Amino acid sequence: MKIQLIAVGTKMPKWVEEGFKEYKRRFPHDMPLELIEITAGKRGKNADIARILQKEGEAMLAAVPKGNRIITLDIPGKKWDTPQLAEQLESWKLDGRDVSILIGGPEGLAPACKAAADQSWSLSALTLPHPLVRVIMAESLYRAWSVTANHPYHRE
């Protein structure tokens, strides 16, 4: 099973790129983690945010390979602790499809992305900086994998 993070935003700080790459490197070969960056719409004082969200959503959905399970990151989504995320990861593997996780921009996700989702996941009730979410996602998914593989990374 392949996991894709499809995220709005490019040109992240070096520490974000390095943090993501560190966890990506740790994933097993049979479960690669990939990051696809979507260019954010130009936001200005008089920007049409609804139109920007629509365009970003179209680009995100176009990046999802046909047949993939789509999971959105959204505050009202399901909240999973590490053991629950590990159970989800196992469930996704048994489903036999690759997984695309959509991470919206500053205003969140387009309605079309939410409508296309098989599941919605709430990483936190907190508002998190979008660059940091990439690193948190990579670490959380790696930790969940480590639980399923009885790897010593996760300790309770």
UniProtKB/Swiss-Prot annotation:
GO CC, alphabetical: cytoplasm
UniProt KW Cell membrane keyword: no
EC top class, as a word: transferase
Any one GO molecular-function label of the UniProt entry: rRNA (pseudouridine-N3-)-methyltransferase activity
Keywords: Cytoplasm, Methyltransferase, rRNA processing, S-adenosyl-L-methionine, Transferase
Subcellular location(s) of the protein: Cytoplasm
Reactions mediated catalytically: pseudouridine(1915) in 23S rRNA + S-adenosyl-L-methionine = N(3)-methylpseudouridine(1915) in 23S rRNA + S-adenosyl-L-homocysteine + H(+)
Pfam families to which the protein is assigned, alphabetical: SPOUT_MTase
InterPro entries reported for this sequence: Alpha/beta_knot_MTases, RlmH-like, tRNA_m1G_MTases_N
Domain of life according to the entry: Bacteria
EC number: 2.1.1.177
List of residues binding S-adenosyl-L-methionine: L73, G104, L123, S124, A125, L126, T127, L128
Role: Specifically methylates the pseudouridine at position 1915 (m3Psi1915) in 23S rRNA.
Record-stated family: Belongs to the RNA methyltransferase RlmH family.
Subunit description: Homodimer.
Record's protein name: Ribosomal RNA large subunit methyltransferase H
Species of provenance: Vibrio atlanticus (strain LGP32)
